Amino acid sequence: MTHYHFVGIKGSGMSSLAQIMHDLGHEVQGSDIENYVFTEVALRNKGIKILPFDANNIKEDMVVIQGNAFASSHEEIVRAHQLKLDVVSYNDFLGQIIDQYTSVAVTGAHGKTSTTGLLSHVMNGDKKTSFLIGDGTGMGLPESDYFAFEACEYRRHFLSYKPDYAIMTNIDFDHPDYFKDINDVFDAFQEMAHNVKKGIIAWGDDEHLRKIEADVPIYYYGFKESDDIYAQNIQITDKGTAFDVYVDGEFYDHFLSPQYGDHTVLNALAVIAISYLEKLDVTNIKEALETFGGVKRRFNETTIANQVIVDDYAHHPREISATIETARKKYPHKEVVAVFQPHTFSRTQAFLNEFAESLSKADRVFLCEIFGSIRENTGALTIQDLIDKIEGASLINEDSINVLEQFDNAVILFMGAGDIQKLQNAYLDKLGMKNAF
């Protein structure tokens, strides 16, 4: 039995990958910071040991998986090289695993995690599917036919993968600390397209995805009859969103998603396209779609009296707009209150005006101090720069959290990729619901 040690095991992808290797029968442990991170819950539930960083964690006969946030100068990586152990980066190791399956990569600036979660759930309704989701969830099912996984474009990590299929949800400028501009992002996706072995499923309304060239067929999905697979007759019901699906202009079937918002229909179309191409049983696919419960930190709801408190990972202007749209469609008679924590100074600086525009779609806006990262913990701007651009916006922290109680009939959206859950939990504690998230 191989013994794997994950350096940075609480990272969302690393946590998922560690769980997969554990499920497949390997001995797994890892190390990370001692501060609480939500991904550790799933690790502890599976009995996977989490250690504080220490060179003495590294033993003979281990394979060491190196998280992308950690340099080769990290004490555990140094010790591994001293012991002449195999040290493999996260993305290279994942690239080796997927070659054993019919693999489906889900990539794009936005919607990766939600789509991967939906894909894994729906495909498991018909065929065994192992999966790696960017919310820290992973499962390795013995004798799986398929492997669904999230493929991140950051630092071109997804170029380590050669999947059978790729779902490309969109191309957008993000990660301004790495990508120079939208053309740089496009070039990365174009290179990724040449790694795909069977087919690409891409959103038809994305002007950049329409320019992608590949050595395999590209199937576009959307709401237009010119798309290869499209949805029509969309109806919002108390059970979710119902819609008809057409493939190559011919009626395919009627589907019901328990979610709300145009972006959730698009995610479903991408998943349905994969199931269609792989000739999965449509009855099983429909049933699985109707039972999808979502993924962690993507519009996760808690209802207290007339308030709906939502935990969401949205940290880019387009994601914020989509989250607000979902709230308005699902709760049309409630006020929408946005509580947002910007993630990284470089992203806040690059999208300052766009953040202001998207957040202004809420009825009220509260902002937290900017959350830094391992690579970047200071910047040339402050949260006041964003507050000044949004009418009626104000600063919020744990000491002033009680201001949210005044919104009696509202959806309270806690959004961000940092530690905004501390603020959520402070509010829930005040309301008498401890540790809901």
Curated annotation (Swiss-Prot):
Biological process according to GO: cell division; cell wall organization; peptidoglycan biosynthetic process; regulation of cell shape
Gene3D superfamilies: Mur ligase, C-terminal domain, Mur-like, catalytic domain, NAD(P)-binding Rossmann-like Domain
GO cellular component: cytoplasm
Coiled-coil features, chain-numbered ranges: none
UniProt cross-references to InterPro entries, sorted A to Z: Mur-like_cat_sf, Mur_ligase_C, Mur_ligase_C_dom_sf, Mur_ligase_cen, Mur_ligase_N, MurCDEF_pg_biosynth, UDP-N-AcMur_Ala_ligase_MurC
Subcellular location: Cytoplasm
Sorted UniProt keywords: ATP-binding, Cell cycle, Cell division, Cell shape, Cell wall biogenesis/degradation, Cytoplasm, Ligase, Nucleotide-binding, Peptidoglycan synthesis
Protein's UniProt keywords contain Oxidoreductase: no
Location (main, coarse): cytoplasm
GO MF annotations in UniProt: ATP binding; UDP-N-acetylmuramate-L-alanine ligase activity
Pathway: Cell wall biogenesis; peptidoglycan biosynthesis
EC number(s) on file: 6.3.2.8
Pfam family, one: Mur_ligase
Ligand binding (ATP): G108, A109, H110, G111, K112, T113, S114
Reaction(s) this enzyme catalyzes, per UniProt: UDP-N-acetyl-alpha-D-muramate + L-alanine + ATP = UDP-N-acetyl-alpha-D-muramoyl-L-alanine + ADP + phosphate + H(+)
Top EC class of this enzyme: ligase
Record's function text: Cell wall formation.
Family the UniProt entry places it in: Belongs to the MurCDEF family.
Protein name, UniProt field: UDP-N-acetylmuramate--L-alanine ligase
Upper taxonomic lineage: Bacteria, Bacillati, Bacillota, Bacilli, Bacillales
Gene name tied to this protein: murC
